[in-house]
Amino acid sequence: MMITLRKLPLAVAVAAGVMSAQAMAVDFHGYARSGIGWTGSGGEQQCFQTTGAQSKYRLGNECETYAELKLGQEVWKEGDKSFYFDTNVAYSVAQKNDWEATDPAFREANVQGKNLIEWLPGSTIWAGKRFYQRHDVHMIDFYYWDISGPGAGLENIDVGFGKLSLAATRSSEAGGSSSFASNNIYDYTNETANDVFDVRLAQMEINPGGTLELGVDYGRANLRDNYRLVDGASKDGWLFTAEHTQSVLKGFNKFVVQYATDSMTSQGKGLSQGSGVAFDNEKFAYNINNNGHMLRILDHGAISMGDNWDMMYVGMYQDINWDNDNGTKWWTVGIRPMYKWTPIMSTVMEIGYDNVESQRTGDKNNQYKITLAQQWQAGDSIWSRPAIRVFATYAKWDEKWGYDYTGSSSTNPYYGKAVSADFNGGSFGRGDSDEWTFGAQMEIWW
């Protein structure tokens, strides 16, 4: 008994050590931004985005507190085989008060199994909700290829000249389908499940320092038996993507061409949309009706120009042509140079211009925005974070058209009808004006 009692503290200590080691093995990653800002004409900070544009230049132009908190752990490993569990919870509030309650968005919960298939070494099987191989332009927070959502797939299959990945994900729309008619009136209140099937061939070395990635995405509305969609709804569509990545000036340049049809044109990033509807108080249905096509040509990157200068840049042309004439032509160009005074202090400027033409009216909206920021960051790269910055932003815009949401409860552009600024004696768009803001912000990823 004495021997047993003497061994007990040792066993407890060993168990505690094992539990501590396991706890330390948990990976904690994430992203967050928050700050405070003011508008020159009074009130809290305003943010500036051109009507019809799908993004905005973000430096000194973000008006919310946003965070993604990721916890993950390799839960099993034997040789080169392993299972990894990953999660991600996101929050967003208006940063107007101390206590701002919000419902979290459960964005990721998946398991990834590596090297589980003997005859496909290096490949990964996965299932669950996941940020899946997302492609974006950081300086305008624009995701141009992103099929994230609940799904499953097999990725990084070595085919000799590149890596092949296969995936299926889902993005449901609120409303859009109906099971039966009462008095010959269909009530399209049932949500519609949209499936996306994705095939990618990446890491193809085609020139010194350059790689090519090709992808095909097919999206479709997946209706329940005996259900129907709103007449004219976009039921399916395709997205084709080609992206060339070139190593240059201690950074990279990405040149992208994308072409989409019908349901894949609304967001233009690989998620199928076009079956959902919005309702007013009388439950009248407004169909998205986005049959048509989209062409996008994009060039963006980040480079180092000597010891003291870094720069991000973007140039993009996007043409969405819809059968209902509610499409747009959008082109944008911008730069973000950074001068490094010390390894942890820099001055950053961002200059961006947007121009959006309405397919229906032929009118154009345009805006340019300039931000100057003094920044302290953890390192001497334009990608170094965390960063604390103080900024001043000036924006000037001239908008000749806007969206008319008469009869619709939604303010999604795809439910609104593009009209000239003075349509029916109204005032649509933001008119011709300018404004400036100033404030401070932190940004971090880890």
UniProtKB/Swiss-Prot annotation:
It comes from the Bacteria. GO terms for biological process: monoatomic ion transport. The record marks Y143 as: Important in sugar transport. The keyword Signal applies. It catalyses: beta-maltose(in) = beta-maltose(out). GO terms for cellular component: cell outer membrane; pore complex. One of its GO terms (molecular function) is maltodextrin transmembrane transporter activity. Keywords: Cell outer membrane, Ion transport, Membrane, Porin, Signal, Sugar transport, Transmembrane, Transmembrane beta strand, Transport. Induction: By maltose. It is found in: Cell outer membrane. It is a multi-pass membrane protein. CDD domains: Maltoporin-like (cd01346). The keyword Membrane applies. The record marks Y31, Y66, W99, F252, W383, W445 as: Greasy slide, important in sugar transport. Pfam families: LamB. InterPro entries: G_neg_Bact_CarbUptk_Porin, Maltoporin, Porin_LamB, Porin_LamB_sf. Residues 1-25 form the signal peptide. NCBIfam families: PRK09360.1. Involved in the transport of maltose and maltodextrins. Belongs to the porin LamB (TC 1.B.3) family. Homotrimer formed of three 18-stranded antiparallel beta-barrels, containing three independent channels. This is Maltoporin. The gene is lamB.
